[in-house]
């Protein structure tokens, strides 16, 4: 890893620093991500939880994903920005929204997931591997 990944919410009440490279980066087209983002997909980077330093407390929203995995999405209680996610069945991982990065250009997607929910108007990199659901682990 060259340098830490840093970012947070729009108002600065939540900040993170991550001292590892992402284990997975994806554009997700599931219906939950579409609803939360207000567009056709959401972009995530997933990291080892042990390498994350978090300042500030997000407001949690717990839900069951299309995959059946229980996840908690965290939003800034002040500005409402969606910032990060955790997974009760995979506590070793911590995912952030690509747009929450201080340098969003560092986001390099590896795949498009939940293409079964995608729309023709949501144009993503055609060279990326595509999965109707999540890729096999």
Residue positions per predicted region:
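A short Gly-Trp-Pro
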Residues: 1-137
């Amino acid at each position: 890893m060259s340098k830490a990944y840093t970012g947070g919410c729009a108002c600065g009440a939540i900040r993170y620093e991550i001292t590892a490279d992402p284990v997975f980066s994806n554009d997700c087209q599931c219906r939950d991500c579409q609803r939360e983002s207000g567009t056709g997909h959401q972009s995530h980077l997933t990291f080892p939880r042990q390498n994350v330093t978090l300042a500030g407390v997000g407001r949690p929203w717990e839900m069951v994903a299309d995959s059946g995995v229980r996840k908690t999405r965290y939003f800034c209680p002040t500005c409402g920005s969606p910032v990060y996610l955790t997974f009760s069945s995979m506590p070793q991982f911590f995912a952030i929204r690509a747009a929450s990065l201080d340098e969003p250009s560092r986001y390099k997607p590896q795949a498009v997931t939940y293409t079964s929910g995608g729309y023709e108007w949501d144009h993503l990199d055609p060279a990326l591997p595509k999965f109707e659901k999540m890729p096999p682990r």
